[in-house]
Amino acid sequence: MAVGTAAALLAALGGILWLAARRFVGSSVQRLHQGRDSGLMRGKTVLITGANSGLGRATAAELLRLGARVIMGCRDRERAEEAAGQLRREVCPAGGPDSGPNSGGAGELVVKELDLASLSSVRSFCQEMLQEEPRLDVLINNAGVFQCPYMKTEDGFEMQFGVNHLGHFLLTNLLLGLLKSSAPSRIVVVSSKLYKYGDINFEDLNSEQSYNKSFCYSRSKLANILFTRELARRLEGTSVTVNVLHPGIVRTNLGRHIHIPLLVRPLFNLVSWAFFKTPEEGAQTAVYLASSPEVEGVSGRYFGDCKEEELLPKAMDESVARKLWDISEVMVGILK
């Protein structure tokens, strides 16, 4: 029995390693824009929420390479400044300071404090943006909370719905004027394939009656898509586009609230190494939607791996999208 078990484990391990080898030989990281496009985003200002780690950090690095002025909107200023310093050393020549938007090299990094779990923080951040920034070419709603235990935001909202949907809903609405005055401009929303397992229960949006952390995450990601589609409808004719994406399964710290048994962790780590995307790979669709001429004027669409994908009918329900918008306006205080 022991010999058989060992043989099975070795076979499974061999299979994983073989698949991993195929994956890395066939799909090493391919940056969307090579040297000839290194200045594609020069002169443009991009705001990325949650840019100090994971997908957000990788997205910031790619856009910095393309010459953008990148504003990192992050909850923890100290961690964000540390990440910004690392990015400057990685991307900017000779580890020096930012080259600046007009230097012909890498772009510029700016750190601003933004806590999406606090509507007052969102308002203060937007006020600072409107006072200090003359333009905003791209807004990337990237920050997120993933399957956390039940907790509430500063304003009393279930954390995942509050941060992933409501915080970004208010942020986007307060910055729309700046985006319109900077047009043509773009909004990029990071959702997830897990939206498929969510539903919008208008009777219990705050999960007061029951809480399932997986379902609530999926619901918040479905809300991201419905928000995108309704916003695209409202922005028709403004030269401001908005699209939504799923990054795939990515190796980030987003899953820090998920408990993996100690004995299973080595296998999980091996599987994630073999099959999950790196943050750099996962960031490519966001970079594509933020910068590529191929999607100029495209709005209200859902993308994965830099290609448009189909949505389930529940993610295209216009009546649900409008109702969610109306309720969200009240929840964040845009309408009383």
From Swiss-Prot:
Which enzyme class? oxidoreductase
Give the residues the record marks as binding NADP(+). Answer: 48-54
Coiled-coil stretches noted in the UniProt entry, renumbered to this chain: none
GO CC, any one term: endoplasmic reticulum
Alphabetically sorted, this entry's keywords are: Lipid metabolism, NADP, Oxidoreductase, Phosphoprotein
One biological-process term from Gene Ontology? retinol metabolic process
**UniProt keyword NADP, yes or no:** yes
Which residues hold substrate? Answer: 177
Q: Which Gene3D superfamilies match?
A: NAD(P)-binding Rossmann-like Domain
Gene Ontology MF term list: 11-cis-retinol dehydrogenase activity; all-trans-retinol dehydrogenase (NADP+) activity
Superkingdom classification of source: Eukaryota
**Which transformation does this protein catalyse, written as a reaction?**
all-trans-retinol + NADP(+) = all-trans-retinal + NADPH + H(+); 11-cis-retinol + NADP(+) = 11-cis-retinal + NADPH + H(+); 9-cis-retinol + NADP(+) = 9-cis-retinal + NADPH + H(+)
Expression across tissues is: In the retina detected in the cone and rod photoreceptor outer segments, weak expression in Mueller cells.
Please tell me whether the keyword Lipid metabolism is annotated for this protein: yes
As recorded in UniProt, its EC number(s) are 1.1.1.300
Q: Which residues carry this modification: Phosphothreonine?
A: 5
User: Which SUPFAM superfamilies does the entry mention?
Assistant: NAD(P)-binding Rossmann-fold domains (SSF51735)
So where's the catalytic machinery, residue-wise? 217
- InterPro entries cross-referenced by the UniProt entry: NAD(P)-bd_dom_sf (IPR036291), SDR_fam (IPR002347)
Name any one Pfam family assigned in the record.
adh_short
Pathway(s) served? Cofactor metabolism; retinol metabolism
Q: What does this protein do?
A: Retinol dehydrogenase with a clear preference for NADP. Displays high activity towards 9-cis, 11-cis and all-trans-retinol. Shows a very weak activity towards 13-cis-retinol. Has no activity towards steroid.
Q: In the UniProt entry for this protein, what further remark is given in the free-text comments?
A: Shows clear specificity for the pro-S hydrogen on C4 of NADPH and the pro-R hydrogen on C15 of retinols.
- Protein family membership: Belongs to the short-chain dehydrogenases/reductases (SDR) family.
Q: What is this protein called?
A: Retinol dehydrogenase 14
